[in-house]
Amino acid sequence: MTSFLSFSAISAHPPTFSGASFRPRSFSPRLFKSCVKCTYAEAGLSSASWSAPIDIVADVKSERVVVLGGNGFVGSAICKAAISNGIEVVSVSRSGRPNFEDSWLDQVTWVTGDVFYLNWDEVLLGATAVVSTIGGFGNEEQMKRINGEANVTAVNAAKDFGVPKFVLITVHDYNLPPFILSNGYFTGKRNAEAELLSKYPTSGVVLRPGFIYGKRKVNGIEVPLDLVGEPLDKIYDSAERFIRPLRSLPASDLILAPPVNVDDLALAVINAVKDDDFFGIFTIEQIKEAAAKMRA
């Protein structure tokens, strides 16, 4: 499941799109101009006897990503990966900067705010992509609001402002009984997906991980989820051909859906931000493929 940012004060139908798609998009990236001065000397003449400066102006792509829920388990991994890849990062969350220390934290702009009451004009200025990790649990209405309405609000704000790409982290398409899939957690996330893919049909990205593992910090204390997730991941990889047929059994995904390393999920997000042809819905396997592409 996605890491969840606590939106406690935050008082449809599933999308018809199936699978990832690839097609060039028409949006213009954020650019800045780089000027290089060169000298040129004619044949037979020394550079001292005749030379003239030539100004070369080149357009260079520069990414600026706004991460909603950037101080959470998944969000902080995304921020860290973005910084490592030379991407400017703005994090938006209700509690601001995380309460642990790391060298990359000072390179992120930490904004404290509620997605429903943000000054989007300030937050989205210059953004080339928005990444949302917003999600959480609670009662039925809270889950619809946190997982659905909060993300729908963010999608519409980004679209209205003209941000060219939006990446949404939701949840694996579990083969659970309908009465479970109809609760606010799942319906909220699917409603958010539908809104994203309708507003960003050729540049919206939906990543659907299952259990996410890694070293999670809770109130400054490290919780090593990788002690469980990493061995499971290796077992599932080695036994994939035996496990795959069993995944058609009702509710089998709860046990048999492969876990995802939080760093792999973060790299898949970076791939989505950098690759203009990367859009659509991405499964657990496709998330891992995108991460491998970034590591290659």
Swiss-Prot record:
Segment annotated as transit peptide: 1-57
Biological processes annotated in GO: response to oxidative stress
Domain of life: Eukaryota
Keyword Transit peptide appears in the UniProt entry: yes
Compartmental location: Plastid, Chloroplast, Plastoglobule
Pfam families, per the entry: NAD_binding_10
One term under GO cellular component: plastoglobule
Keywords of the record: Chloroplast, Plastid, Transit peptide
Family per record: Belongs to the NAD(P)-dependent epimerase/dehydratase family.
PANTHER family xref list: NADH-UBIQUINONE OXIDOREDUCTASE 39 KDA SUBUNIT-RELATED (PTHR12126), OS04G0403500 PROTEIN (PTHR12126:SF5)
Name of the featured protein: Uncharacterized protein At1g32220, chloroplastic
Organism for this UniProt entry: Arabidopsis thaliana (Mouse-ear cress)
